[in-house]
Amino acid sequence: MKTKAIVTLAIGAAFKKRWERLCADNWREYAQKHGCDLVILDQPIDYSERAARRSPAWQKCLILGDPIVKKYDQVAWFDGDIFFNPLEAPNIFDEVPIEKVGAVNSFEDPSSVENKVALERLWKWLRPSPDVPVAGEYKTPQDVYLKYGPPVTPLPAMLNAGVLVASARHHAEIWREVYDNYDDRGNPSYYENVPLSYELVRRDLVHWLDAKFNHLWAWSKFLHYPFLGGPGSRSLRDKILRRLTKYAGNHYEQRIAVACATAALLNCYCLHFGGYAAEMEWVDLKSAATGRVGNLGVR
């Protein structure tokens, strides 16, 4: 038996089908390359009424107590909407001391300066009008912790719980405490993310990973590909022209989207589609495996 494993939850037929269709081969290649097992949990760990009332995302806090998972010395949790760079993604276990939890700082993805710009553009795009803020809008990790409220207090850093490296022996009890003692409080609590981050950061248990291990596709979009923002940002003239070219058989818009998403994967180790899972279809993993974006054929 191997001593390390990649773990995720794939609960629900639609979610599991999407993971198997889009991610399975990519994940198996990464696990095989780095000598890890791959553990896919497709049933809830907790069947209680409380568990049924909240997102399955909370159940990642229970994986370290799972009979299969806890046999490993160290495991890496990945949300099921992530692709590995097939050429350059290194062994994530080499980065993290076993007594620490490996994670990416949410506000340093891809860097602190670029993250600030990406957030500003995101809020601007989401606001119904320039002077009306979005519910849950924030600028700093302190803002997010404050919005969650007591017993959480502001801290200078926040992790993204989409990618976590941990050890059952060292961390199962703390993760279980988060599951038992916290609950959803709406945006921007992001389910388990804020309380789990709070408890791990305040105890100085986090080993900060290179942001490339958990790069949000949303940030690539808002930093580099704003033209992929969506139909709401287009003029009527633009919408008509796009429709006409599509009917003419020139699917240039789709080809450009594929090129952008594939390039984003090549620029990081793990590309995370949190909130944009439908756009996982844009990634061309065959091209990514060559290190080049395929021919667009744009006319």
Feature annotation, model-predicted:
Residues 1-72, 168-169, 277, 283, ...:
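N-terminal anchoring/stem segment of glycosyltransferases
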Residues 8-10, 42, 78-80, 86, ...:
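Short His-Asn-centered micro-motif
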Residues 15-16, 47-50, 84-87, 92-94, ...:
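Short catalytic/ligand-binding loop motif for oxyanion handling, primarily in non-cytosolic enzymes
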Residues 49-78, 84-95, 99-105, 159, ...:
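A conserved donor-nucleotide-binding helix/loop in the catalytic core
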Residues 55-58, 116-122, 223-229:
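Short, surface-exposed amphipathic charged segments that create phosphate/polyanion-binding patches used
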Residues 76, 96, 100, 150, ...:
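A glycosyltransferase accessory/donor-loop signature
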Residues 84-133:
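Conserved donor-nucleotide/metal-binding helix-loop-beta segment in metal-dependent transferases, i.e.
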